[in-house]
Amino acid sequence: MDYSDYTRLDYKTINELFPKGQVSILAAGPGVGKTVFAIQIANQFCRHGENTLYFCLEYDSREIINRLDPVGNGNVRCCINDIPRISLEDILLVIKKRYFSVIIIDYVELMDSIKILDGLNRTDELRKIWMSLDKLAKENDIRIIGVSQLIRIRIDGSEKVLPNKCMNYLDKEFKRDRIRILHREEYYSDCTDCDYLGPVDIITYGNDYSMIYPIKFIK
């Protein structure tokens, strides 16, 4: 994992970007910094007293734990689960045993299929998984944040049309209201040995317009 970091994200911004009662899609290409950003999200929610469950399907749990802030009062606010290929049924079993107001899944494409949906192709499975996660968030009034890896492509310069270029198996309305895209300009440049890590935009697309939350990616 790239041990770069983001500047401190404020709770107000995180609370707006990832509301309760729905699944939020945190999407970016490989190497942009999705996991580091997701850990910062977990840190903020834990710091403000929200019990957080972090499913890390790509990395060892020790890599995640090493980047979590210690909680001053000694209470463990963040639980890490690194069991590979978890399914929606596995998530349901965990949250039945303990309440979590925040669930982060890093990342959803590595989840196992829903057992009752055997026979579907992977694209249809992923659509059902996202819809089921959204239903789970609504029924329990919790935040579910699903990290999603996009195919690395060169964007044509118009970030507003980016949602139309990714995750096309999801309904347009569903995707528009839930997707948050990490966009780092130099990630798409031709410079292969640049050491500069510039600003990162968090782009949202609700209500037919985009909002950009600029943050800083640092070493």
Predicted features and spans:
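Conserved inter-motif catalytic segment of the P-loop NTP-binding fold
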Residues: 5, 48-135, 195-197
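Flexible loop/turn segments at secondary-structure boundaries
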Residues: 33, 60-64, 110-114, 152-155, ...
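The Walker A/P-loop phosphate-binding site
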Residues: 1-72
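Short, well-ordered alpha-helix to beta-strand connector turns
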Residues: 21, 49, 100, 176-177
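Structural motif
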Residues: 25, 102-104, 145
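Short gly/ser/thr-rich secondary-structure transition/capping motifs
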Residues: 4-11, 85, 161-165
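Generic beta-strand/beta-sheet core signal
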Residues: 29, 55-57, 81, 105-106, ...
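Phosphate-binding/switch region of NTP-binding enzymes
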Residues: 14, 131-219
